[in-house]
């Protein structure tokens, strides 16, 4: 199976087009006001239309309430929901039932203890995304360009696909995939020139490197 490549935090038509044309499988739109990649729903809707089924649209939220999820699902019509907060397994199960959409749950990793929640989320999610645990004073729980120790995933044995993220770029994506044996990879900061500013060339380089890995 080919590596699942997700480019997250797209905010412009140009960079979205670069990601889709270069063959991204999943394109992520962030709905979290404190993020430099936050989108309002009308603009996300316009970007979503541009995708035209060429990639899966992923709506990333952080402990979103039902009203926000209703609005996102109604307007963007995402193919996936990504939960990057402290959504419980019960909340994941309930949202899946309400919207009938697959869910990717982010698990924040800093040490081996962080993996103890895996069985509970693996029972309800469709994909798991391993990301670096943010520092306590971080203003957002992801998209920080920080990596975790990939060797922590050694021995992880999931029946569902998982993606690795956090501090990955074209230069280290092959190593990230080799060490973690992940089915996919997710990047945001690693294809940016500054937080929130994606670069079409960096996106293309990243996708090429991920495909070659
Ligand atoms: O991107 C954000 O600003 C963001 C805000 C709130 C929660 C999650 C967020 N991003 C997560 C991602 O973009 C990816 O899933 C991943 O963490 C990318 O990490 P990195 O390549 O290190 O930026």
UniProtKB/Swiss-Prot annotation:
Name the pathway it acts in.
Answer: Amino-acid biosynthesis; L-tryptophan biosynthesis; L-tryptophan from chorismate: step 3/5
Query: Does Electron transport count among this protein's keywords?
Result: no
Q: Which Gene3D superfamilies does the record cross-reference, listed alphabetically?
A: Aldolase class I (3.20.20.70)
Q: Which InterPro entries match?
A: Aldolase_TIM, PRAI_dom, RibuloseP-bd_barrel, TrpF_fam
The record's top EC class is: isomerase
The source's superkingdom equals Bacteria
Give the residue spans that cross the bilayer: none
The biological process GO terms on file are: L-tryptophan biosynthetic process
Q: Which reaction does it catalyse?
A: N-(5-phospho-beta-D-ribosyl)anthranilate = 1-(2-carboxyphenylamino)-1-deoxy-D-ribulose 5-phosphate
GO MF term set: phosphoribosylanthranilate isomerase activity
Disulfide bonds, which pairs? none
What are the EC numbers?
Answer: 5.3.1.24
The record's section on Pfam families has:
PRAI (PF00697)
Recite the UniProt keywords alphabetically.
Answer: Amino-acid biosynthesis, Aromatic amino acid biosynthesis, Isomerase, Tryptophan biosynthesis
Q: Which family is this protein grouped under?
A: Belongs to the TrpF family.
The record's annotation in HAMAP family points to: PRAI
The protein's name in its UniProt record: N-(5'-phosphoribosyl)anthranilate isomerase
Organism annotation: Rhodopseudomonas palustris (strain ATCC BAA-98 / CGA009)
